[in-house]
Amino acid sequence: MESTTAFSAVTSALGIQDVHIMAPYLWMLVLGFVIAFVLAFSVGANDVANSFGTAVGSGVVTLRQACILASIFETVGSVLLGAKVSETIRKGLIDVTMYNSTQELLMAGSISAMFGSAVWQLAASFLKLPISGTHCIVGATIGFSLVAKGQQGVKWIELLRIVLSWFISPLLSGIMSALLFFFVKKFILCKADPVPNGLRALPVFYACTIGINLFSIMYTGAPLLGFDKVPLWGIILISVGCAVFCALFVWFFVCPRMKRKIECEFKSSPSESPLMNKKNRELHCPILKPDPDNIKLPVDGGIVAEVKVPILDMVTVSRTEERTVTFNMGDCDDPIEKEKLNSMETNIDQPMNGSVQLANGNHVQFSQTVSNEMNSSGQYQYHTVHKDSGLYKDLLHKLHLAKVGDCMGDSGDKPLRRNNSYTSYTMAICGMPLDSFRNWDAEARPDEAEKLTVHGADGKKRIRMDSYTSYCNAVADAHMDVEAEEQEEGCIEDVVTDRKSSSSSLEERHDQDKPEVSLLFQFLQILTACFGSFAHGGNDVSNAIGPLVALYLVYESGDVATKAATPIWLLLYGGIGICIGLWVWGRRVIQTMGKDLTPITPSSGFSIELASALTVVIASNVGLPISTTHCKVGSVVSVGWLRSKKAVDWRLFRNIFLAWFVTVPISGLISAGIMALFKYAILKV
């Protein structure tokens, strides 16, 4: 009696009326809801990075802000747009009429498909690899159908479309993103003053963003919003009208406000503001302490590099004057500076055979080959590193304020990370051997730490460095010495090679958006990310809920080809699961999309978002197979390659492509295994 009451309560809560036919399979419905939630969790952990990965990578929003925005728009999108797409997932892959007399097999197949898709997406999220949720569920659906009914009823054309999308999606989206970013770079980023052109282009960018995304959302034909009753010409008219209105609003209201904001920030703090113009950046500060700390270090070819860390008199220096750090490397073209440098002493201690004494009494000992060339070289080049650069701040903080020698404490144990922006430069000017570093970097994983072995008087000493302590450790180590002459000769050769890589890292640093450009593109990127998240919620909730909808409707009606609409509460259930997955595990794939694959700036992030959205709209309308994930990855790689050819992690891109390749077979195999268990061990049909 109690079990009957509990059963009635469950069926009543689910809104099920006629349950006499499928009542023995209630356990399958409950199991399906549990697995569907896990699948929604995996979709949130992996696929949501498509929307906000680039926004987080460019620094426009924090990870927490991205999760909040994505939770809102994914949930709303799943409820308002998800019903339409669920029909395709439920009926577009297999012929469900084959299961008219064996409804329990279709229910078992839905559970198997969700399980196979969830397992592979969770594994991909653990590996930080963005994959297509749609391809996962398609492969899993084909897998269970092959076990249940063989090749009969499988629509193989869908599988062919998926294979084509591996190449069409990233290539087409990459080309469009590259074209858009080339336009932005040529007419805005490369200008001496990018603000005027940026303000002129702002209405066009907003209009395109609103028009493209609005058309994409309306074209889905979501029945809950009545879009299924709007003809195509009506959708185009509404989208264009909203785009024009948005452009006029931005031109007359947003652009003047943005211009005033930029000018206000520039005038309020001309020396400290990030919007400082180029002339002010070139000013030198003549008011320095009379006795600055001089550090002379060897670079390639035996040429001496002198690092000056001058101290400002904060009372007498005006706001327009800056602190500088100078390096002497080769010939100097400025006659005034040349005369000044010729009057300076090298401060190289000859008896110590190429050692340099720092202000705090520490010595830096160099190899014999380097020290001989140091002593014979008398040519210098004056190079300025200004106070707003990361290298200056690092030097000022570590070499002067921390008094050099004190930096060798706990901070010296931090690991050296791959793609370190300061390490190459540090090693180059300090003459440190780099063979072990490069060999390790070619084999080890990116997140592993490097240990550099340096031979000294006290035996082998391992020095670990990160981007904040590498310079300090290299300069302040008093016991650096090289035993073998082959290693000494290799040191100079390594430095020459490594300075090329250091110049490329400096080049990437200069390729960052100017602050005023970032200000122009920040809200645009947030807007495109929110639109993308809204559309993504409507599209990808079907990947998690589509099989559950089939399971629920079959159980409710006993008919595999029921025409009932998708319940809204089921879509909301999937949206909640997606949001939880995003909050718990979404940061992993977001890091891959926004940081690891290539550096992202607001301008490049906007180009990626808008062009990939446009690609999806065009390809969907002309019938080309397309994947949102593949489009986004293709855009990220192409724009990153256009910004800097060495900025893309091609090894990571190769791994992502391999993950795409195995997505369908792996999810299909897992689903087929679970379906075989259901068919031959549990249901025995």
Swiss-Prot record:
InterPro entries reported in the protein's UniProt record: Phos_transporter (IPR001204)
Region (Disordered): 489-511
GO molecular function: phosphate transmembrane transporter activity; symporter activity
Keywords: Membrane, Phosphate transport, Symport, Transmembrane, Transmembrane helix, Transport
Comp. bias intervals (Basic and acidic residues): 496-511
Transmembrane segments: 21-41, 66-86, 106-126, 162-182, 207-227, 234-254, 517-537, 565-585, 606-626, 656-676
Cellular compartments per GO CC: membrane
One Pfam assignment: PHO4
Topology of the protein relative to the lipid bilayer: Multi-pass membrane protein
Major localization listed first in the record, in broad terms: membrane
Alphabetical GO biological process terms: phosphate ion transmembrane transport
Localisation per UniProt entry: Membrane
Function: Sodium-phosphate symporter which plays a fundamental housekeeping role in phosphate transport.
The family this protein is said to belong to: Belongs to the inorganic phosphate transporter (PiT) (TC 2.A.20) family.
Name of the protein in its database record: Sodium-dependent phosphate transporter 1-B
Species whose genome carries this gene: Xenopus laevis (African clawed frog)
